[in-house]
Amino acid sequence: APIRKYDITQCALYKCRTKKRLEHLLCLEPGGLKIIDSIIRYHKFEIDKKHSDEKREITAPDKILKAIQRRILYLLHRVIRPEWLISGEKQKCYIDNGKAHLDGKYVLTVDIKKFYDNCTREPVYQFFVQKLKTSPDVAKKLTDIITYNGGIPTGCPTSQIMAFYAYSDMFSEIADLAKQCGCKFTLYVDDMTFSSTKPFSPNQLRQMIDCVLRKYGHKPKYPKVKYYGPSDYKPITGTVVTPEQSLAVPNGLQNTIYDAFQKVKPLIGTEACSEEDAKQILSLKGQIQAARN
């Protein structure tokens, strides 16, 4: 069933003006915010980047902090966000990003360079003050809970939604530019996709996007700015839109599914399996489902 969503003015955090109220909303003991600094702890680890030999560093919160961040996410996730936002939205996934552009014969893809590294603390604070109308001290506490070392860490439950909210004005400006150029726009974290049934000037749109990004302290990853015509296969966040306007599974995902199947193959016919094996089976199911869509 579709999730009932409401305007930001209906969010429980809206116009939260006292720390006592914030403690109640975050399910903390009275006075719990006073000791918040002592539980702000993170650990770092590396994961493989998809379809690349590079590593991605993840900064993740410890258990207690993660639970509070999850509560903030819960309070924000039912707020209505723009239709063009795909990432972090319940009942949407990267497949929907590809599907949104099936009619687009002409496609421009733009990635933001080191997006998370350049997401700073100040726009997060301003989101709470200006959009959620909290008092400055409440905004500061919320910002302390979900930022680290002056930025948005990559491994928090709140990371995706806050990276969007901190720069929602920037993305809205880009959505308006797309509209002016007659393009459909979608956003998946830092991947922006623009498509149209008619030819448009990719250079003109790219220059305008560049200006908006720089205004907010970001810039495009130039090697990843790509323009595709009607006869091209168009890679869009883990999917491929074919010239026949259907969605295909890229070879990378096919290989991932094959490799994952080889790992779980010895388990066929066995009664019990370890928690790790169960996780691998669930992961394989998810990948097959993604490929089917």
Residue ranges and their predicted role:
Residues T109-K113, G155, S159, Q180-T197:
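Catalytic palm active-site di-aspartate
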Residues V79-W84, A178-F185:
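Long, hydrophobic, amphipathic alpha-helical segments used as structural scaffolds
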Residues K92-I95, L177-C181:
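Short amphipathic beta-strand starts and helix->beta connectors
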Residues A1-K49, E54-V110, F115-D137, K141-N149, ...:
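Right-hand nucleic-acid polymerase module
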